[in-house]
Structures are given as C-alpha cells and as structure tokens.
C-alpha cells in the first residue's frame, strides 16, 4: 500500500511517499518511494505490548482526517539486531496510518504524559522465550 507522509518521520523530513507491506506474520516494512534507498521494519505494538495506549493529538488527527469511522493502524519502528531478542522497539514515536485515505504520520509522544514509553526498548522484555 502506498502512503502519503502528512507529517515527516524524524530524520527523514524530505520523504513524502512510502510503501507499506507485510514481511511475515510479525513484521512489516515501510519503504521510501522518493528515490531514497531506506526503509523501516515495523511491528504492531499491540502484538507484543497489549497495554500500549496513547491518545493521538488533535493536530495529527486533523492531518490524517481521523474520525470514529476511520480504518486506521498503529505501528512502531523496530531496530533489528542479532540475536532478534536484542532488537529494540520505539514506543515513544508510533506511526499512525489512515487506510481510507492512504496517509501516515509519526506521532511523537510527550514523555511527561507517557513516562513508561521509551524510544529504545528491548523486544525481549515483551516476548515470551520459547525453548
């Protein structure tokens, strides 16, 4: 799915168009379509942290044209490491996508409102180890 970036992803302010697709049962990829060769690995935060909760500020809701009927998704960026358990998740800057109008924003959460969310949390803290 091709998406228009309505509010820049930090550090990638010139990127206006991205492609979002599923890699496997857990991970997704958000790839630049603006001639720049970069992408982000993403995960649905609720798969690993069911208590993840935040309010999308009005500004971002307006940019995305969100309302009660909007079909939308929330994803967080993962920095993949070896072994996978050493990978980190950024819960402090979720990416919100409006599937109805193919747009996205990165929401930067206020640390004073969300003191339990960090930009580099080990994924191993949220997944069960299977042996």
Swiss-Prot record:
Annotated Gene Ontology cellular components are:
cytoplasm
Kindly list the biological process annotations in GO that this record carries. bacterial-type flagellum assembly; regulation of translation
Positions in coiled-coil regions: none
InterPro entries in the record, alphabetically?
Flagellar_assembly_factor_FliW, Flagellar_assmbl_FliW_dom_sf
- Give one Pfam family: FliW
Give the UniProt family note: Belongs to the FliW family.
Question: What is this protein for, i.e. what is its function?
Answer: Acts as an anti-CsrA protein, binds CsrA and prevents it from repressing translation of its target genes, one of which is flagellin. Binds to flagellin and participates in the assembly of the flagellum.
Share what the entry says about its subunit structure, partners included. Answer: Interacts with translational regulator CsrA and flagellin(s).
Instruction: Tell me what this protein is called.
Output: Flagellar assembly factor FliW
Gene responsible for this protein: fliW
